[in-house]
Amino acid sequence: MVSFCELCGAEADLHCAADSAFLCRSCDAKFHASNFLFARHFRRVICPNCKSLTQNFVSGPLLPWPPRTTCCSESSSSSCCSSLDCVSSSELSSTTRDVNRARGRENRVNAKAVAVTVADGIFVNWCGKLGLNRDLTNAVVSYASLALAVETRPRATKRVFLAAAFWFGVKNTTTWQNLKKVEDVTGVSAGMIRAVESKLARAMTQQLRRWRVDSEEGWAENDNV
């Protein structure tokens, strides 16, 4: 199974257990070069042929590429590839089951709407773990869902995007802003949350500008009628 980069959506080349993230070579180099501690993370190389996680590890901000790997499909006597690891959680398992069920009834339910509903359920669950009251939960979920809506990537329901959108909602609706607790609740590293949340925030700003321009143009057309 092909895994995709959590930051850009391209095919992933490595998996970082410390960040619970799949990354392509380019994003891995940028992200792990941004901080001395990040650079020390060990990342597992993904076999370019069978797409499984190998037993080859790399560390440091810059990598020689391609790394030396022996694909299990090339050698029947010895396999460098482990069984495919999946970064999962009870929330993501629930998301996958719900989306799969939606595919079986596409004539009645829009799969995108199902994904949004599942994401909202995950946000509510995380708010509960943070101890937020109903009003704050509604506000956080609204902002987080809006952040996901402006994200056009087809893999926007991945845990890293959910965590980033959730942090966006928490930042913009509460005075309680503890990224460490959000990290603990979501299972996504603070560094990954910050990196993706900043992209969501920029996308949100651009979308708000477009909405404002469209609204102003609409009022102008009405005035001319």
Curated annotation (Swiss-Prot):
InterPro entries: CONSTANS-like_Bbox1, Znf_B-box. One of its GO terms (biological process) is photomorphogenesis. It comes from the Eukaryota. A zinc finger (B box-type) spans 5-46. One of its GO terms (cellular component) is nucleus. GO terms for molecular function: DNA-binding transcription factor activity; zinc ion binding. This is B-box zinc finger protein 32. Interacts with BBX21. Repressor of light-mediated regulation of seedling development. Functions by suppressing the activities of positive cofactors like BBX21 and HY5 involved in modulating light-regulated gene expression and growth. It is found in: Nucleus. Keywords: Metal-binding, Nucleus, Repressor, Transcription, Transcription regulation, Zinc, Zinc-finger.
